[in-house]
Amino acid sequence: SAFRELVNPLLIIEQIYQRTGMKIEILSSAEQHFLGYKSIAAIEKGFKKMIQKGTAILDVGGGSLQVSLFDKDALVTTQGLKMGSLRIRQRLQELEKTTIHYDKLVEEFIRNDLMSFQRLYLKDKEIRNVILMGDFITDMIFQEEMEDRIITREEFMKRYEDTVGKSVDLLAQEMEIDPEYASLVVPTMVVCRNFIDIFNAESLWAPGVSLLDGIAYDFAEKKKFLKSVHNFENDILVTSKNIAKRYSSSKSHIQGTMNLCLNIFDSMKKVHGMGARERLLLQIAALLHDCGKYISMEKVSECSYQIIMSTDIIGLSFMERQMIACAVRFNNSAFVYYDELYSMGIAIDRESYIKVAKMTAILRLANAMDRSHYQKVKGIKAVLKDRELPDDRGFCTGHFPGTGTAER
């Protein structure tokens, strides 16, 4: 998160490369937390069992905090909040000297964001378990806990009361860490305690994994060294469906449009040449193509684009999110040539631009087939015939009755 917030990241990355020869790639917030999530999933037995009931993953970083909610083995939502332990310490550094109740000060500082999160995303959800991960400070806090690293709410509260009243120097001495890191202990504990309170959670699990575990797991999965029992792509789709639901998109229409998109995509693989990842991006674009209507019926394209670009979708890179947003934008507005994108504030490479063009064409066709939102077209089979794409009902993408002719 520190790299993401730099005003001159390219210069810093270049300096690192010049001095060390290492090439740095900055992960988006959604990518970082998705890999963290995978690191927990690597402990398959404990993770699978825990997420059967309402569970929250609390990823406490230095600059920000990510909360992911699970219910019945599915990821329901994930949200980022700017209340990392380092950020809190920096903001309250001067005030800390004026009070003997630093924990209460931290609690008041984060209360507004906590209440907003509870009002918007918890509602009637029951969260029984909290999985805690983040910076190594989390491991330091729970270094004396039992082997399975699961503690009850009562045990956590006992540790909390024993910790927050101590000075930074005393914490550094007891935990055998630098005072710089010891100063992050109280903010971390206060954040954890307040989330446990609003969740009304019964137990806390600190698996002791890191981002490196997630990167290793992701690499092994992509190279087919192992097969995960958990469906991560389904989590991305469920999250996208919940975003669409939040913006009151028609469930039947977006589901129908997505199915039509997949039918066309799968039937035309030899023509468009796109793979499984682009298929997933197309599904997400179909699910979110109507979300802008929640803000403006007149400026659907622009509003949909801004919503998607402003929403972290776990598991997607910034470039992938941009591709989805562009496909959704050009679904209703005029498609623009590559050289015009920069004037619109859109920065994608040429390869991604071609993929956006193909995704947009498929999305436009599928959306047109359900213009009435009655799902009259179902179960089509697309075939290529004489350089035209007719479906099994005799219609053709090159010519629709009453609409004129379009070139593919």
Question: Predicted segment positions?
Answer:
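Helical "lid/coupling" subdomains associated with nucleotide-phosphate turnover
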Residues: 2-7, 12-53, 69-71, 77-364, ...
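Short glycine-aspartate micro-motif
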Residues: 55-59
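Active-site-adjacent helix-turn-beta-strand microarchitecture at beta-sheet edges
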Residues: 63-64
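A short beta-strand motif that forms part of the nucleic acid-binding face
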Residues: 71-72, 395
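Amphipathic alpha-helical domain-onset/packing element
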Residues: 365-366, 406-408
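Short, charged phosphate-coordinating catalytic segments
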Residues: 378
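A short interface-forming secondary-structure element
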Residues: 390-407
